[in-house]
Amino acid sequence: RWGARDRRFIAGNIYDIVRWYRLYQSCLTGAQQTTNFYYSIFAVAHILKGFELPQWEEFASINSSDIKDVYQKNIKVRKLKASIPDWLDEIGLQQFGEKEWEKEINALNQEAEVFIRVNSLKATTSKVQTDLTKENIETEIVNNELFNQQEKPLKIIKRQRLQQLESYKNGLFEVQDAASQLVAPFLQLKPGMKVIDACAGAGGKALHMACIMQNKGSILAMDVERKKLDELERRAQRAGVRIISTSIATKEAILKNSASADRLLLDVPCSGLGVLRRNPDAKWKL
């Protein structure tokens, strides 16, 4: 049975290969692209990280010097260096311009950091930090002026499986990107308000709003996918949130709730490209 270190190693390498798949594939030539293909992809990743290949039969056709030579040539081509499809490079160049697009795609190719939001209905930041320290999880407060003093996210220093922790199971915190934690405060919510989250997804922002509202009032969370709303309901139960109800976002449901809320949150679906840091496989599916 694999231990935590083994799982992190395997998962990290798989994500790396998925993220840089096109770049790695472009370094292969001839028979390398058809014979023991996945071994060849692994070999490229191994070589470009500076390791020596083991003397395995599957690597017999791989020449490290050739791989490095082709790599140096290919990284002069942005779509290969960034390991993105042609269509994505064309759209990015058109919308951002060359200089900004290169910054953007470089950022999207970085591994995403992990942030958590303290559930103020159950805990304080200091308590969560103390509990996590006892569970061997190191954190630091995000000291950014964009966040209120009481609303600062915690950054997880070393990526680990947080869902197995007692503090997570007890609903003391939620995993949520730092940028996402900026949204709910902008609504200037007050306890007792009626709020509609019309593109709720799995409910990260709805749960945050419930905390700001001190679990008083009502939040109607809507989405087109029932499975996401089911996950929201599970998260709400764990967090001790009682004011969220869910509904499939149909035309009838929208008309029924027309002009009935104090606040409306629309985190509308967009290109979906912002997920590439966490889900690099998305660029091969769009």
Kindly give the residue locations of the regions a language model identified.
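S-adenosylmethionine
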Residues: 1-286
